[in-house]
Design a protein with these regions (language model features):
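Core dinuclear metal-dependent hydrolase active-site scaffold
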Residues: 39-61
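Active-site environment of divalent metal-dependent phosphoester hydrolases
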Residues: 24-31, 54-57, 66-71, 98-102
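Active-site neighborhood of phospho(di)ester-bond hydrolases with catalytic His/Asp-centered motifs
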Residues: 18-24, 48-49, 60-66, 92-94
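Acidic, His/Gly-rich catalytic cores of divalent-metal-dependent hydrolytic chemistry
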Residues: 69-139
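Short, surface-exposed, charged loop/turn segments at secondary-structure junctions
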Residues: 5, 34-38, 62-66, 75-82
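Core catalytic region of metal-dependent phosphoesterases/phosphodiesterases
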Residues: 1-41
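Solvent-exposed alpha-helices and their adjacent loops that cap or buttress functional pockets
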Residues: 13, 41, 53-54, 82-84
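Generic preference for hydrophobic
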Residues: 37, 48, 120-122
Length: 139
């Protein structure tokens, strides 16, 4: 991490209780980046973890699968990072340059919600677009 990036991170952390959720990309806490580290964090009705539980888990917010959705619009296919959620659990997209994406129609994501009963919240340039999972295209 560059000195400039470290200074920016420290500025964001100032006055906050900063908690990093660790995962397979960073099994050991990084040094000198501030904050606390946890594999799982429960705050009230919410549970934050890197990898989604294979069991139903209301209030779960996870990553790991890096969902992306592909939809047909105006005669072409558009693929974008997305949040996948059924209102009870949420799988977040990857925002880093090194992480790819997994289609929301892939079994690893779709099986978390059952019967394609979730919404893909696609990230646009200026807003978020919601698509029912059934509207999303497979690879």
């Amino acid at each position: 991490m560059t000195d400039t990036s470290r200074a920016s991170l420290k500025a964001l952390q100032r006055g906050r209780d900063w908690i990093w959720i660790t995962g397979n990309h960073d099994p050991e806490p990084a040094e000198n980046i501030g904050g606390r580290f946890a594999q799982v964090l429960a705050i009230g009705p919410l549970t934050f973890r890197h990898e989604p539980s294979t069991q139903p888990c209301d209030g779960e917010i996870a990553g790991h699968l890096h969902p992306l959705a592909r939809v047909a619009r105006r005669g072409r296919s558009v693929s974008r990072r997305c949040f996948a959620s059924d209102g009870l659990r949420l799988v977040m997209p990857a925002f880093g340059a090194y992480a790819g994406g997994l289609n929301v129609r892939d079994r690893a994501i779709a099986s978390l919600f059952g019967a394609l009963s979730f919404t893909a919240h696609m990230l646009g340039e200026r807003r978020i677009y919601a698509f029912a999972a059934a509207q999303c295209l497979s690879d």
